[in-house]
């Protein structure tokens, strides 16, 4: 049994974390919050949107917000997390600020897309009305 864990967190686009010396990890799934220590039994679970917290051998806490994912523990020392997206932070306050900024940017993008969609829809309706209505000069 190894006294540390190896943590890998990846998204489809990047490798967020590849840490060799982790002594403890906390995460959340549908049943609630749980912790993983070196020597943990093999384990597979689906994560809910949560903030992963871990501590390395240097006793520094790290954080990663994930938007759902799959966590796998294998051989008692390897923890692998695959998620759709993740955001790293050295403190919860900084991570919260990053998440709020990203959420605001996402909402703004969605709002702009809805406005553009409405504009295109109105333009298409006007074009159809021009085509379907006979012009006054043709009568």
Swiss-Prot record:
The protein, known as: ATP synthase epsilon chain 2
Major site of localization recorded for this protein: membrane
Keyword Cell inner membrane: yes
A cellular component annotation (GO) from this entry: proton-transporting ATP synthase complex
One protein family per Pfam: ATP-synt_DE_N
InterPro entries from the UniProt entry: Alt_ATP_synth_F1_esu, ATP_synth_F1_dsu/esu, ATP_synth_F1_dsu/esu_N, ATPsynth_dsu/esu_N
Topology of the protein relative to the lipid bilayer: Peripheral membrane protein
Organism: Paraburkholderia xenovorans (strain LB400)
Gene encoding the protein: atpC2
A GO MF label: ATP binding
UniProt subcellular location: Cell inner membrane
Quaternary state and interactors: F-type ATPases have 2 components, CF(1) - the catalytic core - and CF(0) - the membrane proton channel. CF(1) has five subunits: alpha(3), beta(3), gamma(1), delta(1), epsilon(1). CF(0) has three main subunits: a, b and c.
Protein role: Produces ATP from ADP in the presence of a proton gradient across the membrane.
Record-linked SUPFAM superfamilies: Epsilon subunit of F1F0-ATP synthase N-terminal domain (SSF51344)
Family note: Belongs to the ATPase epsilon chain family.
Transmembrane residue ranges: none
CDD domains, sorted: F1-ATPase_delta
Entry keywords, A to Z: ATP synthesis, Cell inner membrane, Cell membrane, CF(1), Hydrogen ion transport, Ion transport, Membrane, Transport
